[in-house]
Amino acid sequence: MKQDVIKFDNEIYQIDVFMENKSGRMSCYYIDSSNPMLVEVGPSKSFPYLISSLESLGISEVKRSAMTHLHLDHIGGIGHLVEKYKEHFVYIHELGIRHLPNPEKLWKAVSDVYTEEWLSTNWGEIKPTPTKNIRSLQDKELIDLGNGRKLEAIYGPGHAKHHYTFYDEYSKTLFMGDTLGLIYPHGDFVQPNLPPPDFNKELLFNTLDDLKKLD
């Protein structure tokens, strides 16, 4: 299975999960600290690529993940991850506690935009995630990465009302989800990401202003 993994400084790995079977469409991130963290999982159809890349790094178990928001291109594979690693738990906006165990409403909302056939073909169906495997995030919550390293959860609506950005102060890295829009690896074009019904321009600009204040 094809793999595309980039190692950055401070033990951060970018993993291309070949969303829609194309490179450069969706990345997940693995922070290989003493208390590791996976950021994003991608859609269900991309799950085999994620696992293959993790195993190529010698990672046989993933105990924790953090999701920026509840859109299926970012969280669709969570149920698969929990099925594979029974003790795994995911940090996510509090709405995740309602929707991940019963993802039918998430599926319906997205299929109204993309159609069920397109979703099934390109992203794959989402599996339920048991409530016991879900941790709801609080704004400014600090998640322990070990050895004094923390991942800060920063609530940042605009793209979606359930959106968080994660800040690793140790490496000065922001994991921004869709806050900045769609940024492709080969070119300077940035496409705003404006999904119905949650997109709010004013809130998005407020979020960006807040993030600019980070050290």
Give names to the regions the model predicted:
Residues 47-95:
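Active-site metal-binding motif and surrounding structural segment of the metallo-beta-lactamase
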Residues 46, 70-75, 98-99, 160-163, ...:
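Active-site environment of divalent metal-dependent phosphoester hydrolases
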Residues 7, 100-157, 161-215:
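Metallo-beta-lactamase
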Residues 39-42, 63-69, 91-93, 156-158, ...:
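Active-site neighborhood of phospho(di)ester-bond hydrolases with catalytic His/Asp-centered motifs
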Residues 57-60, 145-149, 214:
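Glycine-rich phosphate-binding loop signature in dinucleotide/nucleotide-binding domains
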Residues 2-56, 166-176:
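Conserved beta-strand hairpin/beta-sheet module of binuclear metal-dependent hydrolase folds
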Residues 37, 95-99:
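Short histidine/acidic/glycine/proline-rich micro-motifs that form metal-
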